[in-house]
Amino acid sequence: MQKKYYELFFIVEEQYKNLFLGFAFDLGIEAIEEKDNGIYIRSHESLEELSWALEIFAQKLTTTFNLNHKIISNLSLVEKENKDWIQEYKKGIKPILVDNVYIHTTWQEEKKNCINIKINPALAFGSGHHESTHSCVKFLQKFSKSKLRALDLGCGSGILGIIMAKFGCNVEICDTDELAIDSSLENARLNGVDFHKAWCGSIDKANGLYNLIVANIIADVILILEKDIKNHLEDNAILILSGILDKYSTRIKEKFQDLELIDEMQINEWCSFVYKNNKKDK
């Protein structure tokens, strides 16, 4: 074991966190931990170039989303004495129970009499601990039915798609990050389910209509995809929107007011909405 390793820490606004995680994974970084309201990246190799790249990436996101404030802060890089931080990382991840769905890692035991979802959090995009994921898991247990054609839009690690498949849905997944697709497919294999279709890209590449769509993505992207999402809803389809900070909830509701809002949930500052495709102009 090498005597030294490098640790990079930064804090990023919650709604952009997955973008930074995906960026780091794309660069081949695997040892990532979310802790202390921020993100730790550790490596035996120097992380100076990654630190610089993260700052450039943050600047580009600020320009893309027309923001007037920094979305990344407290960026620091230190050299530390080595320890088995992979084992430390494993100790810090706890399983999640949401009603009858039990989400756990590959090194944790299953729970009897529950729908067990096994996730390898090292692959990409988390292990289901986020508030918005919690809301989606709760809603999917209510609205997932056998034989429904379903889409996990922005699938990340594939948790939501796997849950829908466990309930008998014919699931398709998509994400703009190819690593997320690979992660979802591997996690599906771990859980003994298959996705009917998976592609790198967004809903504009989807074919046909869906009975159930779940989009656990940031509000800005939901607003951009609003028309495409609606155009792929079957009559009476269910649409679950999540990953929405409460300060954006009014904008989301205004954009989707032609659909019937049938349920909603807020955990801390994170909002989730469930719509039914009973359009008012029908």
From Swiss-Prot:
Ordered alphabetically, the record's keywords are:
Cytoplasm, Methyltransferase, S-adenosyl-L-methionine, Transferase
Q: What is this protein called?
A: Ribosomal protein L11 methyltransferase
InterPro entries (alphabetical):
Ribosomal_L11_MeTrfase_PrmA, Ribosomal_PrmA_MeTrfase, SAM-dependent_MTases_sf
Q: Which residues bind S-adenosyl-L-methionine?
A: T133, G154, D175, N216
- NCBIfam families the UniProt entry points to: PRK00517.2-4 (NF001786)
Q: Which organism is it from?
A: Campylobacter jejuni subsp. doylei (strain ATCC BAA-1458 / RM4099 / 269.97)
Q: What does this protein do?
A: Methylates ribosomal protein L11.
Any single GO CC term annotated in Swiss-Prot or TrEMBL for this entry: cytoplasm
Which Gene3D superfamilies does the record match to this protein?
Vaccinia Virus protein VP39
> GO molecular function: any one?
protein-lysine N-methyltransferase activity
Q: Which family does it belong to?
A: Belongs to the methyltransferase superfamily. PrmA family.
Q: What is its EC number?
A: 2.1.1.-
Which catalysed reactions does the entry list for this protein? L-lysyl-[protein] + 3 S-adenosyl-L-methionine = N(6),N(6),N(6)-trimethyl-L-lysyl-[protein] + 3 S-adenosyl-L-homocysteine + 3 H(+)
